[in-house]
Amino acid sequence: MINEYGYRPNVGIVIGNFNGQVLWARRYKQNAWQFPQGGINSGETAEQAMFRELFEEVGLRPKDVRILTTTRYWLKYKIPHQFIRWDAKPICIGQKQKWFLLQLVCKDTRINIQCGKKPEFDSWKWVSFWYPLSQVVFFKRNVYRRMMKEFSRAIMLPE
């Protein structure tokens, strides 16, 4: 589902533990790390998409987490020209994202990145809250900065 401007509606998920760390996942067979994220299907709310993606990508159910907050606004990033799939119709030039900050309320042994039909990730780890900002692929960095600043205020972390 791509909007008239070429942006795909999407949800992003930041999962925190009780040590102030966040789940950081490596894309399948790539040296690229990111937070879980995924598209919103037609007829789905952002929250419904988030819970579906949460299970598909990391094997967690709604009872395993608590929603702490969401981004106030949708955040957008453009995909670099060389990564756009020009043969796809409609053409997707970027993502429009609603982000969710979740608190893990179960043991992290419930995290299962092999849960979906096609795994998105092949590894994961706990990292400090601000670590992802310097590690995420360059074209997502501004969205991560804006989202993480907003979330840090919500959970009263120093910037």
From Swiss-Prot:
Belongs to the Nudix hydrolase family. RppH subfamily. Signal peptide: none annotated. Its cofactor is a divalent metal cation. The keyword Disulfide bond does not apply. SUPFAM superfamilies: Nudix (SSF55811). It comes from Baumannia cicadellinicola subsp. Homalodisca coagulata. One of its GO terms (cellular component) is cytoplasm. GO terms for molecular function: mRNA 5'-diphosphatase activity. Its EC number is 3.6.1.-. Residues 6-149 form the Nudix hydrolase domain. One of its GO terms (biological process) is mRNA catabolic process. HAMAP family: Nudix_RppH (MF_00298). This is RNA pyrophosphohydrolase. Accelerates the degradation of transcripts by removing pyrophosphate from the 5'-end of triphosphorylated RNA, leading to a more labile monophosphorylated state that can stimulate subsequent ribonuclease cleavage. A motif (Nudix box) lies at residues 38-59. InterPro entries: Nudix_hydrolase, NUDIX_hydrolase-like_dom_sf, NUDIX_hydrolase_CS, NUDIX_hydrolase_dom, RppH. Disulfide bonds: none annotated. It comes from the Bacteria. PROSITE patterns: NUDIX, NUDIX_BOX. The gene is rppH. The keyword Cytoplasm does not apply. Keywords: Hydrolase.
